[in-house]
Regions:
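Bacterial N-terminal signal peptides that target proteins for export
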Residues: 2-14
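Bacterial N-terminal signal peptides
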Residues: 12-23
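Flexible, membrane-associating and regulatory peripheral segments of lipid-active enzymes
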Residues: 25-389, 398-404, 420-423, 666-673
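Serine-dependent carboxylesterase/thioesterase catalytic core
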Residues: 112, 116-191, 195-196, 391-395, ...
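Short, solvent-exposed loop/turn segments at secondary-structure junctions
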Residues: 396-397, 428-429, 483, 528-530, ...
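Short amphipathic alpha-helix adjacent to the substrate-entry channel of hydrolases
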Residues: 403-419
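Extended hydrophobic/aromatic segments used for targeting, binding, or gating
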Residues: 416-445, 617-641
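C-terminal subdomain of alpha/beta-hydrolase-fold enzymes, centered on the catalytic histidine
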Residues: 545-673
């Protein structure tokens, strides 16, 4: 028994000894399967698949795998830095695709660790302090971002497969984002260097350290766009709240930026720069139009070379600045790629900084800081091949009235390719006739400046969109007055003899006109063609007496309103003349305008609001304008929407406006392509 027991113990000891000996083998390292499985949710799967240094703060799975293949996941690449990047560059065991995409992300990781100067911004997104000097980390930071751009560029266009062959791969989207971000950051760095006088070399060449940037020729921007930006803002850094409902972009290649210019109109509430004040004095009196002072742009860095080695050693990239409204695709090394664009950022930033809402009320009541003449804003640089879509706001309003209208229209590719949006900003305290006359003169100046021969597409088939009082002005632009307005006012208005004489001498040129030949279609939105009841009520008359006309107006044609006396509207000098009085249904002017014949060559449409869905349509109103005043019996179309007076912002109204514009394009044999 003792022998048997000893044999059992010996055999057991032998088995454990063998198992311990075999413990180093992979198959017997543990008591269980060598591969285990666990379930993940779809969200976790997508996060693992698409997460990278930008979205999660950690390297992507693709880069981690490449580091493992190269044997760099431990040791030199245990923490981010230049040694890891140099080791990856020296690796000979990974494909170029994997190497370049991983190096782009590793350089990005390194760039994000470098300190950046902190700047404080106001609620409107404006930097509180200007860049006056560059920090000590400027050059290393620029070098890192340029390396990101170059490695990403090499991956996209100079590795084993073309960009089209990788079209549906998540990795290509990641690397494209690295390139776009790197170009964005490098562009801002370049602008800061320019602003501080650090840039050296000729105007078309900028040298910063090892890099020489070659400025590519412009792709046709107008002369207005040659202004120097006072600020360069990445569109991706902006977040908008308030009434703006959406941000519209086009995915693609390039950095989306907003170039903030000084506003020559001086309409913004914030103080203009010294340069703007100097130019404003010389331009405001003569130039009543300008481009929107915050145009969007897309920037590319193009690295030269016939092969991968040449691209990776190109320290003289070409800097291309594109207008995304003009250019939708670019050719890079024989491949057509879409150009990235942000169609909302520049427009929204302009409105956010303008303080138009307060200024329009100051203007109406004659407060300090208002405006006294109309100004035409072009939402993009003038394009001779795009027709004009001109928007005119209403009483006590401003371009802010069109924030969602313009934004939603410009998301439509066909409308964006066919039209360029212009908006009038005008003092709504002025008599309607004077605003209309000033706008006509402005349009004449603009077309004469850009198209003296009148042959450009932009000079023909304009579409007008007018809201409320802006619709009345739009109607005047397509009407023939003859002597009707002057005769009617002389016959019906309660005027003194002095007022009548002033009307004949100074008023007649303003009240006599023909249809604007450029206009072929008009959309009237909540327009009081025959005035309103509200303007004639006690409250309306009281508000009307608070309206203050600019002194320059009082000294000119508006003296008609005050018996030749430069006096505020106090109700003691006969016929009152201001915008609110003009909208009274019993006002001789608005009644005369309603009888003017509109051009038979012009198509017109009505978008009308009713505050309540119940009741007969003929007895409804939008809170201010009754249906009987906004209805036109011979309109091409009429759309009635349950809404308040600001119906232009309602989604059904924008949808109807898009329908009308597409109908217009079809009528002109245009598809927007």
């Amino acid at each position: 028994m003792a022998t048997t027991g000893l044999g059992f113990i010996g055999r057991t000891t032998l088995i454990f000894t063998v198992l311990l000996t075999l413990g180093g083998c992979a198959t017997l390292r543990q008591f269980g399967p060598s591969v285990q499985v666990a379930s993940v949710t779809p969200g976790q799967y997508i996060a693992l698949k698409r997460g990278d240094i930008l979205t999660s703060g950690k390297l992507s799975a693709a880069t981690i795998e490449t580091l493992r293949v190269a044997g760099l996941d431990e040791g030199v690449c245990a923490k981010p830095g230049l040694p890891c990047i140099e080791a990856m560059e020296s690796s000979i065991v990974v494909r170029e695709e994997d190497k370049r995409s991983s190096l782009a992300e590793l350089w990005l990781q390194y760039a994000m660790t470098l300190p950046a100067p902190k700047r404080e911004y106001s609620a409107s997104g404006r930097a509180k302090t200007a860049v006056t000097e560059l920090d000590a980390d400027f050059q290393p930071r620029l070098d890192a971002w340029m390396q990101v751009a170059r490695q990403a560029y090499a991956y996209l266009f100079f590795t084993e497969r073309t960009a089209n062959q990788r079209g549906f791969e998540d990795r290509q989207t990641q690397v494209r984002d690295y390139y776009n971000l790197a170009v964005q950051e490098a562009s801002v760095q370049l602008y800061n260097a320019y602003a501080t006088g650090r840039v050296h070399g000729q105007a078309s060449h900028f040298q910063l350290g090892r890099w020489t940037f070659v400025l590519a020729p412009s792709d046709g921007a107008s002369a207005l766009d040659q202004r120097t930006p006072s600020e360069l803002v990445p569109a991706a850094s902006l977040s908008f709240t308030g009434t703006l409902r959406s941000v519209h972009r086009r995915d693609g290649f390039g950095a989306e930026l907003v170039a903030v210019m000084d506003d020559p109109a001086g309409s913004t509430a914030t103080a203009p720069s010294a340069a703007a004040q100097a130019t404003q004095a010389s331009t405001s009196a003569t130039q009543s139009w300008s481009e929107m002072p915050s145009p969007s742009m897309t920037v590319l860095l193009r690295f030269s070379g016939k092969n991968l080695w040449e691209v990776l050693h190109d320290d003289e990239p070409e800097l291309e600045i594109h207008d995304p409204y003009q250019v939708s695709e670019v050719t890079l090394h024989g491949q057509q790629v879409p150009l990235a664009a942000n169609f909302t950022a520049g427009y929204a930033l302009w409105l956010a900084r303008s303080n138009f809402s307060r200024q329009s009320l100051r203007t109406l009541f004659g407060g300090k800081g208002g405006i006294d003449t109309p100004h035409l804003y072009m939402m993009q640089p003038y394009d001779p091949n795009r027709r004009v879509l001109l928007m005119i706001h209403g009483l006590a309003s401003s371009p802010e009235a069109w924030v969602n209208v313009a934004n939603e229209l410009l998301r439509d590719d066909e409308i964006r390719r066919e039209f360029q949006v212009w908006q009038f900003y005008y003092p709504t305290n002025m008599p309607i006739a004077m605003s209309h006359d000033a706008m006509r003169h402005t349009l004449t100046e603009v077309f004469k400046h850009f198209d003296p021969s009148g042959k450009a597409q932009a000079s023909h088939d304009m579409v007008l969109v007018g809201h409320s009082m802006g619709g009345v002005i739009a109607r005047l632009m397509i009407s023939s007055s003859g002597d009707h307005l002057v005769d009617t006012l002389l016959a019906t208005a309660q005027m003194t003899p002095a007022q009548r004489e002033l009307l004949r001498t100074k008023g007649a040129p303003v009240l006599t006109f023909l249809p604007e030949p450029e206009v072929s279609r008009v959309v009237f939105i909540a327009t009081p063609h025959r005035g309103t009841d509200v303007a004639g009520t006690r409250l309306g008359r009281w508000i009307g007496r608070l309206v203050r006309l600019p002194l320059t107006v009082l000294e000119d044609v508006a003296t008609i309103a005050n018996d030749g006396q430069i006096d505020r509207n106090d109700g003691k000098h006969g016929y009152q003349m201001n915008s609110i009085q003009n909208l009274d249904k019993d006002d001789p002017f608005v009644r005369a305008v309603a009888d003017l014949p509109m051009s038979p060559k012009v198509h017109y449409h009505s978008i009308i609001a009713r505050a309540k869905a119940d009741g007969p349509l003929e007895k409804t109103d939008d809170g201010l304008v009754p249906y009987w005043s906004s209805h036109l019996p011979h309109a091409d179309s009429e759309k009635v929407i349950v809404s308040g007076h600001s119906v232009q912002e309602a989604t059904p109204a924008i949808v109807e406006l898009r329908r009308i514009l597409h109908e217009d394009m079809q009528a002109h044999g245009r598809t927007g392509k």
